[in-house]
């Protein structure tokens, strides 16, 4: 190497470390989560130069400049028309009233009555209900998905939406720009040309060349005529119905009727304002239901704006409130320290805590990261079940035969801190019983991970898991 080349390389080396140290100081001054700060320091040390690119795309915060602020969120929620029963909180079991208050304060999530609830654990049944809902629409159809692909399932739904738009039904669709980045723009344009209102969330032309990539709308919501709605983990793609790579797809959706649908509607219309700058409101979008059952739900949203993470905060409170059992399902398990400690605390307090994750998910890296977290929870007595019946994509929590949650939220850093997520927290014995039965049915397709098996992992696997864990806040 010539002297000039050596000088250039030396200059680049010192320039890199000057920039890296400046960024590290900047991160520390933000008072960010310690785990995230350490993760970025490890990136700069072990992946020099390339680490700067990773930080540019995934580490810089565009929240203040490009995402709606906390004040705007509050104003939008206040302008949404919701008829709220002020006595509802007194009608749920007393031990959960503090949780309902927490959601009201952290996410302005009203406690709304449920006339009918159906837990859908078969994705083919989800597809049937979806097309039934679309077919029955008289006034409006609102859909929001992270993924909406132009395959057989997606094309069939597109045709159904177009047909309804031509009948004069208002049809609005929000899809995530990154989740659908492989879908040709002509697919969505064909819907627009037919009268469907279509918007993408935080449009990214080149997903890997923008730090907008970091903040995605992961919500899955369907609302028809303000009277019936669905929420859960399913997107619009063939693999959600037919499976993937020879594996069946196991997911959960929750169909709701009654005032609780207004919570789904509110979430959708706030996001609609984000993407279209058009405020849609009025009583025709928020009809008043009978509320004939002593069943209630709160539709809770979380986003990267502000400091409160309402959904994960709700999970932490559920773990603290649990007395008999709490069962959790998630496809990806990379939790933050607070949730992890809460999980262990519940188990060490005598609660039957069961965690179900896929034995093999659709992400090998996520599987390695998940395994690195399981040692602590196993030592605390948490029962970990590895689902081998296919791709487990269900995101559910059920507690003590009364309280349950179904939504889009994974138990990982991305869902907790970066994504726009939504989950329904339901106060109802029948829904809890159905989710409990579903969990126990899934458990038959699992194997229990033992402490001995976990400790006998190969040295190479343990090293790989520990290394990937360093980057779990970034995955």
What are the functions of these language-model segments?
Residues 1-313, 317, 321, 361, ...:
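N-terminal localization/anchoring segments of enzymes in phospholipid and broader phosphate metabolism
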Residues 384-388:
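Active-site donor-binding acidic/aromatic loop of nucleotide-activated sugar
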Residues 369, 381:
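CN hydrolase (nitrilase-like) catalytic-core segments centered on the catalytic cysteine
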Residues 322-324, 332-354, 358-359, 363-365:
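Helical hairpin unit composed of two closely spaced alpha helices linked by a short loop
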Residues 395:
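Catalytic-core elements of nucleic-acid end-processing and repair enzymes
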């Amino acid at each position: 190497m010539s002297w000039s080349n050596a000088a250039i390389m030396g200059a680049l080396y010192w320039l890199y470390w000057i920039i890296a140290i400046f960024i590290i100081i900047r991160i520390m001054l933000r008072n960010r989560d310690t785990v995230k700060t350490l993760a970025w320091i490890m990136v700069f040390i072990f992946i020099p130069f390339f680490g700067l690119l990773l930080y540019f795309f995934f580490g810089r915060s565009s929240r203040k400049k490009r995402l709606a602020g906390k004040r705007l969120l509050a104003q939008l929620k206040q302008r949404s028309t919701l008829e709220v029963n002020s006595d509802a909180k007194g009608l749920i079991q007393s031990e959960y009233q503090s949780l309902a208050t927490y959601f009201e304060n952290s996410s302005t999530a009203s406690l709304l009555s449920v006339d009918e609830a159906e837990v859908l654990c078969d994705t083919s049944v989800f597809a049937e209900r979806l097309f039934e809902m679309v077919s029955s629409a008289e006034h409006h159809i609102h859909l929001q998905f992270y993924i909406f692909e132009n395959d057989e399932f997606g094309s069939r739904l597109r045709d159904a939406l177009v047909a309804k738009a031509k009948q004069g039904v208002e049809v609005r669709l929000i899809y995530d720009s990154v989740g659908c980045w492989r879908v040709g723009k002509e697919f969505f344009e064909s819907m627009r040309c037919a009268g469907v209102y279509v918007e993408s969330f935080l449009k990214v032309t080149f997903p890997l060349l923008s730090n907008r990539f970091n903040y995605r709308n992961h919500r899955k919501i369907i609302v028809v005529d303000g009277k019936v709605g669905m929420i859960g983990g399913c997107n619009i793609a063939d693999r959600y119905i037919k499976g993937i790579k020879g594996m069946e797809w196991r997911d959960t959706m929750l169909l709701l009727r009654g005032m609780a649908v207004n919570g789904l509607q509110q979430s959708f219309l706030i996001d609609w304002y984000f993407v279209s700058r058009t405020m849609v409101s009025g009583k025709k979008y928020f009809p008043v239901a009978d509320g004939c059952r002593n069943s209630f739900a709160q539709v809770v949203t979380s986003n990267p704006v502000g400091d409160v993470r309402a959904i994960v905060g709700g999970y932490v409170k559920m773990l603290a409130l649990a007395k008999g059992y709490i069962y959790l399902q998630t496809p990806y398990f990379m939790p933050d320290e607070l949730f992890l400690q809460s999980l262990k605390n519940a188990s060490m307090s005598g609660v039957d805590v069961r965690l179900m994750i896929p034995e093999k998910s659709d992400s090998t890296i996520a599987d390695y990261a998940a395994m690195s977290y399981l040692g602590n929870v196993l030592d605390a007595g948490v029962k970990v079940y590895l689902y081998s019946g296919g791709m487990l994509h269900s995101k559910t929590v059920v507690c003590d035969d009364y309280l349950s949650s179904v939504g889009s939220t994974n138990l990982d850093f991305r869902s907790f801190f970066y994504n726009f997520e939504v989950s329904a927290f339901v106060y109802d014995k029948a829904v809890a019983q159905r989710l409990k039965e579903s969990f126990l049915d899934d458990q038959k397709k699992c194997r229990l991970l033992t402490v001995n098996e976990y400790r006998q992992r190969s040295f190479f696997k343990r090293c790989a898991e520990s290394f990937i864990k360093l980057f779990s806040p970034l995955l």
